[in-house]
């Protein structure tokens, strides 16, 4: 091979490799998503502000990517990871039991029996009491949401994400309802 031909060949080969890399880069870089990518969560309070000495609710809205599901709180099998929400209440606050929605029984190719799952948009509700001693102003209630997201092909590792419920506390007379579409009794 003549030097000029070798340079041309090397340059052409490099161009082809670059073109193939660009064409297939999305496939080469595609990764299995994480549980954090599959479920996007938002936190809302039923009162804005909430009244000192009163009660309110916190809603955690889970938006689950199409094609995925998470196990419901009432799981179908012992080995499954149930959806779980925990709160760490600061001084001046107490809370009740989390209200989980009823799951849907779905059949998947990997299981012989239907599984109790959440799909799409799911709302978890946590009742909270702001005691008469609750500090006024912006307060934070740390939350931890644990779930395991699965598709029909794979289950991702269990995921625990920290969330923050930001609540403004005012005198009881200033309390006003907020985000009622998330807290109506029909949901």
Go through each PLM region and give its residues.
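Bacterial N-terminal signal peptides
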Residues: 10-27
